[in-house]
Amino acid sequence: MKLNEIRDNEGATKDRMRVGRGIGSGKGKTAGRGVKGQKARTGVAIKGFEGGQMPLHRRLPKRGFNNPGATDLNEVNVGRIQQAVDSGKLDPSAPVTVEALVAAGVVSRVRDGVKILGVGELTASLTFQVARASKSAVAAIEKAGGSVTQSLAATDGAVASA
Protein backbone atom coordinates (compact mmCIF):
# COMPACT_ATOMS: atom_id res chain seq x y z
CA MET A 1 0.00 0.00 0.00
CA LYS A 2 1.21 3.48 -0.89
CA LEU A 3 0.24 6.91 0.46
CA ASN A 4 -1.77 7.71 -2.64
CA GLU A 5 -3.80 4.49 -2.18
CA ILE A 6 -5.09 5.32 1.33
CA ARG A 7 -8.87 5.77 1.48
CA ASP A 8 -11.79 5.40 3.90
CA ASN A 9 -13.49 2.05 4.33
CA GLU A 10 -16.48 1.42 2.10
CA GLY A 11 -19.56 3.07 3.63
CA ALA A 12 -17.58 4.97 6.29
CA THR A 13 -18.54 8.35 4.83
CA LYS A 14 -21.77 9.52 3.23
CA ASP A 15 -21.85 11.96 0.33
CA ARG A 16 -23.27 15.33 1.31
CA MET A 17 -26.85 15.95 0.22
CA ARG A 18 -26.95 18.22 -2.83
CA VAL A 19 -30.19 20.15 -2.74
CA GLY A 20 -32.22 21.48 -5.65
CA ARG A 21 -31.24 18.70 -8.06
CA GLY A 22 -34.64 17.39 -9.16
CA ILE A 23 -37.64 15.88 -7.36
CA GLY A 24 -36.25 12.34 -7.62
CA SER A 25 -33.43 13.24 -5.25
CA GLY A 26 -35.80 13.90 -2.35
CA LYS A 27 -34.39 17.40 -1.90
CA GLY A 28 -35.51 19.00 -5.14
CA LYS A 29 -38.01 21.78 -5.86
CA THR A 30 -37.97 23.76 -2.57
CA ALA A 31 -34.63 22.28 -1.44
CA GLY A 32 -35.55 22.12 2.25
CA ARG A 33 -36.65 25.76 2.40
CA GLY A 34 -40.38 25.14 2.74
CA VAL A 35 -42.84 27.15 0.68
CA LYS A 36 -42.57 30.85 -0.25
CA GLY A 37 -41.98 33.63 2.27
CA GLN A 38 -38.91 35.59 3.26
CA LYS A 39 -37.00 32.55 4.51
CA ALA A 40 -37.42 30.79 1.19
CA ARG A 41 -35.66 33.63 -0.62
CA THR A 42 -31.96 34.27 -0.85
CA GLY A 43 -30.35 36.84 1.45
CA VAL A 44 -32.65 35.76 4.26
CA ALA A 45 -31.22 37.52 7.32
CA ILE A 46 -31.79 41.24 7.59
CA LYS A 47 -28.96 42.41 9.85
CA GLY A 48 -30.21 43.79 13.16
CA PHE A 49 -33.86 42.88 12.46
CA GLU A 50 -35.43 41.23 15.50
CA GLY A 51 -38.85 40.36 14.17
CA GLY A 52 -40.42 43.76 14.84
CA GLN A 53 -39.06 44.01 18.39
CA MET A 54 -37.12 47.22 18.96
CA PRO A 55 -33.57 46.28 17.92
CA LEU A 56 -30.73 46.34 20.42
CA HIS A 57 -28.89 49.19 18.71
CA ARG A 58 -31.98 51.37 19.15
CA ARG A 59 -32.75 50.23 22.72
CA LEU A 60 -29.35 51.32 24.04
CA PRO A 61 -28.66 55.01 24.70
CA LYS A 62 -26.42 57.04 22.44
CA ARG A 63 -23.03 57.71 24.03
CA GLY A 64 -20.16 60.03 23.18
CA PHE A 65 -19.03 61.44 19.87
CA ASN A 66 -15.99 61.57 17.61
CA ASN A 67 -14.23 64.89 18.02
CA PRO A 68 -13.23 66.14 14.55
CA GLY A 69 -10.81 68.63 16.13
CA ALA A 70 -8.88 66.07 18.20
CA THR A 71 -5.15 65.77 17.56
CA ASP A 72 -4.26 62.28 16.37
CA LEU A 73 -0.65 61.67 17.37
CA ASN A 74 1.46 58.63 16.50
CA GLU A 75 2.98 57.23 19.71
CA VAL A 76 6.60 56.04 19.75
CA ASN A 77 8.52 54.62 22.71
CA VAL A 78 12.09 55.71 23.43
CA GLY A 79 13.14 52.04 23.32
CA ARG A 80 11.99 51.82 19.69
CA ILE A 81 13.99 54.96 18.82
CA GLN A 82 17.08 53.45 20.52
CA GLN A 83 16.65 50.32 18.34
CA ALA A 84 16.62 52.53 15.23
CA VAL A 85 19.81 54.29 16.41
CA ASP A 86 21.52 50.95 17.18
CA SER A 87 20.62 49.52 13.76
CA GLY A 88 21.96 52.65 12.00
CA LYS A 89 18.58 53.76 10.63
CA LEU A 90 18.52 56.94 12.73
CA ASP A 91 21.44 59.39 12.83
CA PRO A 92 22.18 60.29 16.50
CA SER A 93 23.95 63.55 15.54
CA ALA A 94 20.93 64.95 13.63
CA PRO A 95 17.77 66.17 15.42
CA VAL A 96 14.98 63.59 15.68
CA THR A 97 12.03 65.02 13.73
CA VAL A 98 8.87 63.55 12.21
CA GLU A 99 10.61 63.35 8.82
CA ALA A 100 13.61 61.53 10.34
CA LEU A 101 11.34 59.00 12.10
CA VAL A 102 9.40 58.33 8.88
CA ALA A 103 12.63 57.94 6.88
CA ALA A 104 13.96 55.50 9.50
CA GLY A 105 10.75 53.46 9.32
CA VAL A 106 9.93 54.03 13.00
CA VAL A 107 6.52 55.53 12.14
CA SER A 108 4.41 55.58 9.01
CA ARG A 109 1.46 57.71 7.90
CA VAL A 110 1.90 60.51 10.43
CA ARG A 111 -1.35 62.38 10.97
CA ASP A 112 -1.00 65.31 13.42
CA GLY A 113 2.50 64.56 14.69
CA VAL A 114 4.43 62.25 16.99
CA LYS A 115 4.31 61.78 20.77
CA ILE A 116 7.34 60.22 22.44
CA LEU A 117 6.57 57.81 25.31
CA GLY A 118 9.01 56.66 27.99
CA VAL A 119 8.90 52.85 27.65
CA GLY A 120 12.28 51.19 27.14
CA GLU A 121 15.92 52.18 27.56
CA LEU A 122 17.50 55.20 25.85
CA THR A 123 21.29 55.48 25.90
CA ALA A 124 21.93 57.75 22.90
CA SER A 125 22.07 61.52 23.43
CA LEU A 126 19.42 62.81 21.02
CA THR A 127 17.76 66.14 20.25
CA PHE A 128 14.00 65.75 19.71
CA GLN A 129 11.70 68.15 17.83
CA VAL A 130 8.25 66.57 18.21
CA ALA A 131 4.63 67.52 18.89
CA ARG A 132 4.44 66.00 22.38
CA ALA A 133 6.49 63.94 24.85
CA SER A 134 5.41 62.29 28.10
CA LYS A 135 7.05 63.23 31.41
CA SER A 136 8.76 59.84 31.61
CA ALA A 137 10.06 60.23 28.04
CA VAL A 138 11.46 63.71 28.77
CA ALA A 139 13.12 62.34 31.92
CA ALA A 140 14.67 59.41 29.97
CA ILE A 141 15.90 61.71 27.17
CA GLU A 142 17.44 64.25 29.56
CA LYS A 143 19.01 61.45 31.63
CA ALA A 144 20.74 60.22 28.44
CA GLY A 145 22.01 63.77 27.82
CA GLY A 146 19.49 64.80 25.17
CA SER A 147 16.88 67.53 24.86
CA VAL A 148 13.23 67.84 23.80
CA THR A 149 11.42 70.64 21.96
CA GLN A 150 7.64 70.18 22.00
CA SER A 151 5.26 72.00 19.67
CA LEU A 152 2.39 70.94 17.45
CA ALA A 153 3.71 73.40 14.84
CA ALA A 154 6.79 71.14 14.48
CA THR A 155 4.62 68.49 12.84
CA ASP A 156 4.36 67.58 9.20
CA GLY A 157 1.86 70.08 7.71
CA ALA A 158 -0.37 70.20 10.79
CA VAL A 159 -1.82 73.41 12.20
CA ALA A 160 -1.01 74.31 15.82
CA SER A 161 -4.16 74.22 17.94
CA ALA A 162 -4.76 76.67 20.77
UniProtKB/Swiss-Prot annotation:
Basic and acidic residues compositional bias, start-end: 1-18
Keyword Nucleus: no
Keywords: Ribonucleoprotein, Ribosomal protein, RNA-binding, rRNA-binding
Disulfide pairings: none
Biased composition (Gly residues): 21-35
GO molecular function, one term: rRNA binding
Annotated region (Disordered), positions in chain: 1-42
A cellular component annotation (GO) from this entry: cytosolic large ribosomal subunit
Domain of life: Bacteria
One Pfam family here: Ribosomal_L27A
Positions of transmembrane segments: none
Protein family according to the UniProt entry: Belongs to the universal ribosomal protein uL15 family.
UniProt cross-references to PANTHER family, sorted A to Z: 50S RIBOSOMAL PROTEIN L15, LARGE RIBOSOMAL SUBUNIT PROTEIN UL15M
Its job: Binds to the 23S rRNA.
Subunit details: Part of the 50S ribosomal subunit.
This protein's name: Large ribosomal subunit protein uL15
Organism: Methylobacterium sp. (strain 4-46)
Species lineage: Bacteria, Pseudomonadati, Pseudomonadota, Alphaproteobacteria, Hyphomicrobiales
